């Protein structure tokens, strides 16, 4: 039986509630993990150095969005954005070619940090969703374009 607090909910249920209600992340409990499906959000895998610069750009434009480190040691971070009906295939090919960005395909399950230690790699927030909500994918793409324009010598095409 899961541990429950005074309100009758488990710490995992409480964390899911925080992610869903306060931060707008459409996640769910899946065993000991909290997962988020890329069918419900737009997710872009980016090299950590570029993701940090994109985070700075989003911060200065007041469009902060959650950024996740899956804890796999790959050196990549996942930028989360609101889902979009736009076709990103043209944009995705250009970003993959220029700077190793990858739009994660629909249906992939992403593990979010939770109160229970998960089996395997432990995800953690690079940018914790404190008051920020998922930003539109267009805001994230705008920040990516600005960063790539400003540092072409660091990440050549």
Which ranges hold each PLM region?
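Catalytic core of tubulin tyrosine ligase-like
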Residues: 79
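Signature for HUH/AEP ssDNA processing cores
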Residues: 1-73, 83-85, 131-134, 138-141, ...
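DNA replication initiation modules
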Residues: 87-157
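Extracellular structured ligand-interaction cores
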Residues: 41, 74-76, 107-109
């Amino acid at each position: 039986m899961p541990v429950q607090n005074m309100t009758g909910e488990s710490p995992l249920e409480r964390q899911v509630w925080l992610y869903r209600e306060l931060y707008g992340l459409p996640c769910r409990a899946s065993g000991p993990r909290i997962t988020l499906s890329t069918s419900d959000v737009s997710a872009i895998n980016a090299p950590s150095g570029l993701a940090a610069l994109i985070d700075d750009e989003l911060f200065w434009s007041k469009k902060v969005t959650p950024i996740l480190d899956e804890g796999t040691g790959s050196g990549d971070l996942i930028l989360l954005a609101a889902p979009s009906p736009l076709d990103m295939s043209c944009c995705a090919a250009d970003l993959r070619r220029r700077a190793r960005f990858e739009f994660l395909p629909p249906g992939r399950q992403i593990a979010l940090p939770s109160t229970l230690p998960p089996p395997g790699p432990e995800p953690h927030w690079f940018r914790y969703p404190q008051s920020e909500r998922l930003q539109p994918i267009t805001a994230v793409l705008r920040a990516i374009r600005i960063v790539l324009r400003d540092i072409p010598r660091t990440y050549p095409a």
